[in-house]
């Protein structure tokens, strides 16, 4: 296997990513027959099958996935090498592929802007998605750093805390539970909920919180994949929600939403910077992690009281 070239690995990566020989060939500037020949030679030399040929396209085998992992790791190393050379030259440049869970989009722009003020030459490509999507991109080497809660456990990562992440129950102004003190879990579970989709970190936290009550989330309410839509639905009186306090600062200050005083809330989770443990940290990654660990918490809204309209200090 030592004779495998990076060009061959890139061929495997393109076929894995695009699923079709013709699409991979077009992306690489090759003809379909030429790319097919490369794959066949590689399979013959290694004595393995890299792909299953199906009607739906090329599906990587376990061997193909191992080649894909190697290709992405080498690509990461080449990016790190390029950034390191720039750093040795004294150039404060580089690229950073940043993934942020959807809850983080309420503070990430301010944090990124502050970082760019300090290191303006670093190019940042931002991806926003739910927890499952961010983890998938981190696993597949498609992002360098993630800002998220609850780091993944199915592969090794470097996770560092940079701030608190409070989760709260919200209701529309005028709701019967607004202003009620020490609401029990059993009482809150009787309400109609607006919940995030499966795979969301907020939903996982809610499921854990209500695990001692005889209810399933599917029985409690409606699934909505957007924090913004959830907030508007709560304001309209369609139900209550469990949500990151960092997403509701303006609505609470304006009196459109209230934070309910449910016993054992706010639930205090944490925000992490997360990167693959086997990932070579580029100078751009190192600079961003240093900045977030030193200054990231100041961009997070602080919940000073559990309720009502003056909950944010």
UniProtKB/Swiss-Prot annotation:
Segments of the chain annotated as binding DNA: 21-40
Keywords tagged on the record: Activator, DNA-binding, Plasmid, Transcription, Transcription regulation
MF GO annotations: DNA-binding transcription factor activity; transcription cis-regulatory region binding
A Pfam family recorded for this sequence: LysR_substrate
Every HTH lysR-type domain range: 1-61
Purpose of the protein: Transcriptional activator for the cbb operon for RuBisCO and other Calvin cycle genes.
Family: Belongs to the LysR transcriptional regulatory family.
UniProt-recorded name of the protein: HTH-type transcriptional regulator CbbR
